[in-house]
Amino acid sequence: DQIQRYARHIVLPEVGGVGQEKLLEASVLVVGAGGLGAPMLQYLAAAGIGRIGVIDDDTVDLSNLQRQIIHRTQDIGVSKAESAARMIRDLNPEVRVDLYKERITAANALDGIQPYAIVADGTDNFATRYLLNDACHLAGKTLVSGALLRFEGQLSVFKSHEGEGHPCYRCLFPEPPAPGSVPSCSE
């Protein structure tokens, strides 16, 4: 069944059977199940990432559905983490899904990221980006950081725990922008 499910990965010389086994053993925590996090979660599950954590304290709103396609109309009012976890299980029941219906904070960040090798930031605020950067640096975790604004986006991978030559988010952006100086995703 796995050979058939992951056949398109396995035939790629860059992935193959060994690479697919690594994906099946991988663990990723996705922080945010909205505009960025939702497609990340779908592709990670489809690729066969063995363990996926979903953390989000928000609920699904009607305005989310046109761009956060992991959620459905019947999920309006439901926790985004719960809705996303259900869709992941439907897409790939072999994936272990950890569900956290809470906000990541300074009080829970280090413990929250500990079980995962990679942390993917799908949030839309600078405070959380800096928090995840600092927690990943301290815990020796890889941080995948994405950001979107209208039709523009950026993606970076930070491995600052690997030492010199591996900058962190804070190395590139030492100070958060002043409040109100950068538009939010809702604008």
Residue ranges with predicted function:
Residues 1-187:
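Adenine nucleotide-associated cytosolic modules
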